[in-house]
Design a protein with these regions (language model features):
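Divalent metal-coordination and catalytic microenvironments
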Residues: 15, 42, 49, 99, ...
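Active-site metal-binding motif and surrounding structural segment of the metallo-beta-lactamase
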Residues: 26-72, 146-151
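Short, acidic/turn-prone active-site loops that include or flank metal/cofactor-
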Residues: 27-28, 44-45, 68-70, 87-91, ...
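Portal/gating segments that form or line small-molecule/metal binding sites
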Residues: 53-107, 119-121, 193-196
Length: 210
């Protein structure tokens, strides 16, 4: 399930399966310019980075973005026909890839307000459902997620900490859980280790971050 899936840093994820997909490209080390689809969860600099998008975009790359980012992409000069704006809690399909948006927001801090309608994504590839949570706390919406693989923030401060993330994973019970959002801006490598330690034995915790 995790073949050809990388956590490049922070919450920057690359999936190379039927298509090459980036989620929140950030601190990309060189020009790859190979993205079929780029998913953006919200507009904070460590998730929406135009500098890093330029390193992965190619002719015809499809953007999946929250509505509020549309103006920024158009000002940057990206083709409107290549952009799909999404709402939280909806299902979509692009380039043969099915995906669903899950609201991503804070419940006890002010960094990611619910009313902004920022999102995480459940992306289905070859029948496997990958949940990329975005910047979120435990919410009523993500407690109902059904997925096979979950990539969730564990670093705290702006999102769930490792204890909260483990509690969410133990509730939704994916087969595999991968920690993100630690070790670069907030959170430590120990947070990832402690997250895995707290998982139910039936759930496989794996660190993918380089």
């Amino acid at each position: 399930m995790l073949d050809n899936i990388e956590v490049l840093c922070h919450s920057s994820i690359r999936i190379n399966k039927e298509k090459i997909i980036y989620i929140d490209p950030f601190k990309i080390d060189k020009n790859y310019n190979d993205a079929d689809v780029i998913f953006i969860t919200h507009d904070h600099y460590d998730h929406y980075s135009e500098e890093d998008i330029d390193k992965v975009i190619k002719e015809g790359t499809t953007f999946i973005i929250p509505e509020e980012l549309l103006t920024k992409l158009l000002v940057k000069g990206y083709n409107k026909n290549d952009i799909i704006t999404v709402e939280a809690g909806k299902q979509y399909i692009t380039q043969g890839i099915k995906f669903k948006t899950i609201p991503a927001y804070n419940t006890n801090k002010a960094f990611h307000p619910k009313e902004n309608e920022w999102v995480g994504y459940i992306i289905e590839i070859k029948g496997i459902r990958y949940y990329i949570a975005g910047d979120t706390d435990i919410t009523e919406e993500n407690k109902k997620v059904k997925c096979d693989v979950a990539l969730v923030p564990v670093g705290g401060t702006y999102t769930m900490d490792f204890k909260e993330a483990a509690r969410l994973i133990n509730e939704i019970k994916p087969q595999i859980a991968v920690p993100t959002h630690y070790g670069d801006i907030v959170g430590t490598n120990q947070d990832a280790t402690d997250f895995i330690r707290l998982l139910h034995p039936i759930i496989k915790g794996i660190i993918l971050k380089k």
